[in-house]
Swiss-Prot record:
Belongs to the intron maturase 2 family. MatK subfamily. One of its GO terms (molecular function) is RNA binding. This is Maturase K. Keywords: Chloroplast, mRNA processing, Plastid, RNA-binding, tRNA processing. Usually encoded in the trnK tRNA gene intron. Probably assists in splicing its own and other chloroplast group II introns. Disulfide bonds: none annotated. It comes from Diplacus aurantiacus (Orange bush monkey flower). GO terms for cellular component: chloroplast.
Amino acid sequence: MEEIQRYLQLERSQQHDFLYPLIFQEYIYAFAHDRDFNRSILSENPGYDNKSSLLIVKRLITRMYQQNHFLISPNDSNQNTFLASKNDLRIQIISEGFAFIVEIPFSLRLISCLEGKKKKIVKSQNLRSIHSIFPFLEDHFSHLNFVLDILIPHPVHVEILVQTLRYWVKDASSLHLLRFFLNEYCNWNSLITPKKASSSFSKRNQRLFLFLYNSHVYEYESIFGFLRNQSSHLRSTSSGVLRERIHFYGKIERLVNVFVKVKDFQANLWLVKEPCMHYIRYQRKSILASKGTSLFMNKWKCYLVTFWQWHFSLWFHPRRIYINQLSNHSLEFLGYLSSVRMNPSVVRSQILENSFLINNAIKRVDTLVPIIPLIASLAKAKFCNVLGHPISKPVRADLSDSNIIDRFGRICRNLSHYHSGSSKKKSLYRIKYILRLSCARTLARKHKSTVRTFLKRLGSELLEEFLMSEEDVLFLTFPKVSSTLQGVYRSRIWYLDIISINDLANHKSKF
């Protein structure tokens, strides 16, 4: 972001919020390309096309300067060559530039906030992160009873997303151009349904839509977060917070008058007074958990559905919201199957001559790797069949053996790294076995040999070197403390460099 600040004239851009000229700047597309390329190497397989170049960007900007291709006219819209030839690469470049430009006001606002208040960093900014979910699973999940498993629907039209962005971006020209681009070049069904997505709006281009979608979801989450955060102090008996509680009840009454026009909402106002509510979300999946009863969760379900449908045009289907009891059901979230299990422990006590046994049941959170969906993802990516038997992948003839092994090893290490928070690692061993044998069969297929002959000729150590997990590397580096580290790695470890869900955990993969 520092490099962008050197290019931008911050005095003018921050004063007028004028983003439209940035669309015609070459460095914007260069920054957008480099950012997506670097992130794809960290978390995905290297499959980024090398067709994009500054020469193509210059030609695209020149065409945008020479002719008014984005001008809508009912008479000549069909004759517009820029609209008629929906070039995949051109659409990809423009969408990457749009995604980068609309994020600039948010990034600059965050930087100015942190620079002006270095001592007072807003906690809500830190909590709105994927890293806040892992402590929630560790610390609070075992103390809850019921969860609302909610699949947030997409808005019915792209115009709703653009209207939401108007509160943050004051440049009308950029918004009009963004609206026109989304309506003309991007199929709305392909945006909201990944299975229908064409090559013209690939996974990298989904960043623009995800940014608009998260901005829309943030609007109603901010109101819900206010009720949740303030209600956590309602049961305090200290006289110092009595005035704050009185003001909070007044704010709730105003929210009822401003945001909610439901007749029976006044009678259900006590819903927001429950302090034991927890809300987490990642992408479209959100969870509302509480210590309350099933009746209490049903009332929250009715309230939230009515609230979202009336004021944010989010139409929920009843089958998209589930009320599950944690002791009987597993929760699928972030590529894990999380559940609360009773772990019995027997303690022998003795008082004088009498001895007796005490049975204690302690709640424990289990985070398991969903092996069946993960194998289905591997089968979809052609690493194995539907039964989990490894198969060879067709690869290009110009790829070297080390390049093939490195690609398989990257997938294996990413899966081990992401699912290190699993309480049971046996499922990961099966995934590693599938990837290792699939890699061996792919190499044997390339050399027109059998797996046994290939491994006998090159040695199995070649595969072990590239497919070694992080735990194995640590044990080899520090052999004297390996016994201690083995006990550590049997427990859950959440790595802080996990910034997005793994593709295979998301049931999507490309090689």
